[in-house]
């Protein structure tokens, strides 16, 4: 069952050959589309191996693989807009932990998922690797319980 034009309203970046790459943090670039299967609970996983941001103290680049897993509700994130959004961190100065939490909060604001987790596997600097993990489960649902459980067990992956 293909999507019709009405279902694709608001998706402007996918297939656009005149892509504009943001030069600064750009949450407004994120686009969403309707989940055709809101009655099914299923995971969507993105692996983003080319994430870069800047150290807020030194201005040096930080590199990471960002893992995003979510259980959609009504809306889902469009992947090209996600790619451009993550690219917008390239000149953004923030700590690793901040980047992961900002990404999660922006995706919650966009999609209102049942559950989401964002994990950053940052390349070691100064001999230390930082791997922040943030998650969220919709309040008052079984996903709130899942989020709490995953928070304490995420390193057992």
Swiss-Prot record:
<dbReference type="GO" id="GO:0005829">
    <property type="term" value="C:cytosol"/>
</dbReference>
<keyword id="KW-0963">Cytoplasm</keyword>
<keyword id="KW-0560">Oxidoreductase</keyword>
<comment type="similarity">
    <text>Belongs to the GTP cyclohydrolase I family. QueF type 1 subfamily.</text>
</comment>
<comment type="function">
    <text>Catalyzes the NADPH-dependent reduction of 7-cyano-7-deazaguanine (preQ0) to 7-aminomethyl-7-deazaguanine (preQ1).</text>
</comment>
<dbReference type="InterPro" id="IPR043133">
    <property type="entry name" value="GTP-CH-I_C/QueF"/>
</dbReference>
<feature type="active site" description="Thioimide intermediate">
    <location>
        <position position="55"/>
    </location>
</feature>
<protein>
    <recommendedName>
        <fullName>NADPH-dependent 7-cyano-7-deazaguanine reductase</fullName>
        <ecNumber>1.7.1.13</ecNumber>
    </recommendedName>
</protein>
<keyword id="KW-0671">Queuosine biosynthesis</keyword>
<dbReference type="GO" id="GO:0006400">
    <property type="term" value="P:tRNA modification"/>
</dbReference>
<feature type="active site" description="Proton donor">
    <location>
        <position position="62"/>
    </location>
</feature>
<keyword id="KW-0521">NADP</keyword>
<feature type="binding site">
    <location>
        <begin position="77"/>
        <end position="79"/>
    </location>
    <ligand>
        <name>substrate</name>
    </ligand>
</feature>
<dbReference type="Pfam" id="PF14489">
    <property type="entry name" value="QueF"/>
</dbReference>
<dbReference type="GO" id="GO:0033739">
    <property type="term" value="F:preQ1 synthase activity"/>
</dbReference>
<feature type="binding site">
    <location>
        <begin position="96"/>
        <end position="97"/>
    </location>
    <ligand>
        <name>substrate</name>
    </ligand>
</feature>
<comment type="pathway">
    <text>tRNA modification; tRNA-queuosine biosynthesis.</text>
</comment>
<dbReference type="InterPro" id="IPR050084">
    <property type="entry name" value="NADPH_dep_7-cyano-7-deazaG_red"/>
</dbReference>
<dbReference type="InterPro" id="IPR016856">
    <property type="entry name" value="QueF_type1"/>
</dbReference>
<dbReference type="InterPro" id="IPR029500">
    <property type="entry name" value="QueF"/>
</dbReference>
<dbReference type="GO" id="GO:0008616">
    <property type="term" value="P:queuosine biosynthetic process"/>
</dbReference>
């Amino acid at each position: 069952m293909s999507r019709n034009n009405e279902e694709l309203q608001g998706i402007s970046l996918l297939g656009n050959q005149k892509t504009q790459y943001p030069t600064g943090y750009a949450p407004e670039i994120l686009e969403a589309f309707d989940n055709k299967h809101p009655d099914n609970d299923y995971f969507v996983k993105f692996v983003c191996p080319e994430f870069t941001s800047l150290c807020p103290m030194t201005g040096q680049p930080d590199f990471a693989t960002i893992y995003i897993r979510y259980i959609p509700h009504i809306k889902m994130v469009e992947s090209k807009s996600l790619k451009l959004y993550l690219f917008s961190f390239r000149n953004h100065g923030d700590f690793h932990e901040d980047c992961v939490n900002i990404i999660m909060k922006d995706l919650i604001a966009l999609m209102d998922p049942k559950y989401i987790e964002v994990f950053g596997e940052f390349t070691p600097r100064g001999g230390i690797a930082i791997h922040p993990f943030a998650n969220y489960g919709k309040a008052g649902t079984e996903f709130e319980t899942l989020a709490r459980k995953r928070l304490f067990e995420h390193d057992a992956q």
